[in-house]
Amino acid sequence: MTTGPFVPNPTIDPKSLGKVGVLMGGRSAEREISLMSGNGVLAALRARGVDAHAFDPGLQAVADLAKQGFDRVVISLHGRFGEDGTIQGLLEQFGIPYTGSGVLASALAMDKEATKRQWQTHGLPTPDFVMLHAGADWQAVADRLGLPLIVKPAREGSSIGLTKVTSVAELPAAYEKAARLDRDVMAEQFIEGDELTCPIIGEGESATALPLIRIVAPQANYDYQNKYFTDDTRYECPAPIPADVAARVQALVVQAYRGLGCRGWGRADIMLRKSDNAPFLLEMNTSPGMTGHSLVPMGARAAGISYEDFVLQLAASASLELHASTDWKPE
């Protein structure tokens, strides 16, 4: 596994990428952020001379990508219908290369329960959790996980629907809030310590962890508002932690990325326990944000990679997982 410096390919000819679609918007609760990410990516590609065009699958049929002659797409969609394997499956059907993880890895990473169970199978550390339902024994949940704990939808991103619960009495309302967004709701053990995130690029043995970022949010509340719409959240990159701890976290992140079968790029969220510097994996994002507040560009800059260089490299990495045979004939 690789945690060393990543050097972008300086020989990419923008014209060789053909007509590039930047998928943005979509139909998820993260539409607004997706539009911000997509417009940043679009501007970067055009600045490098790429024939790039915006495409909103929330307003246009994905089949139009093939009809309009797109050679590849950069996925700047976040959340459902863009980060969960659905759009990836359609692009495989139409034979249009795309950035990021394939169908299965995208679906796994979008589902927090599936992600955690996969990591547990690989022996990777992740906080204990319980799946909730309306008739749950709230006291039993608190007894198992301890307080405070986190309640969140199993298939949303950007901390949408997330609540930090400090008493048993708060659990029913936290569950209802999350259940309005997803039928599957998770209660997760709260790990006290530093909140870290780590961008990853590449695939398989070539997967590379970029510098870690420590997130210091107001009142330690890194919610949707503090992620995207405030300047009060502080980001420290590289994270000010001991070098040996940082290397251990980066190695763990690469294992987590590979364990889900991710490719192209991603970003792992981690808690570093205060008592002993033990890392715990929280989530894997397979289509991370690329806004002015986003963390992947920050990690890339710390590694000496400009926003435009990163986006150009990302567009060049577009590929298909499946290669349909043209020789098959029915018997």
Swiss-Prot record:
It comes from Ralstonia pickettii (strain 12J). Its EC number is 6.3.2.4. Pathway: Cell wall biogenesis; peptidoglycan biosynthesis. HAMAP family: Dala_Dala_lig. Its main location: cytoplasm. Its cofactor is Mg(2+); Mn(2+). Cell wall formation. Residues 116-316 form the ATP-grasp domain. This is D-alanine--D-alanine ligase. ATP binds at residues 142-197. InterPro entries: ATP-grasp (IPR011761), ATP_grasp_subdomain_1 (IPR013815), D-Ala_lig_Van_CS (IPR000291), D_ala_D_ala (IPR005905), Dala_Dala_lig_C (IPR011095), Dala_Dala_lig_N (IPR011127), PreATP-grasp_dom_sf (IPR016185).
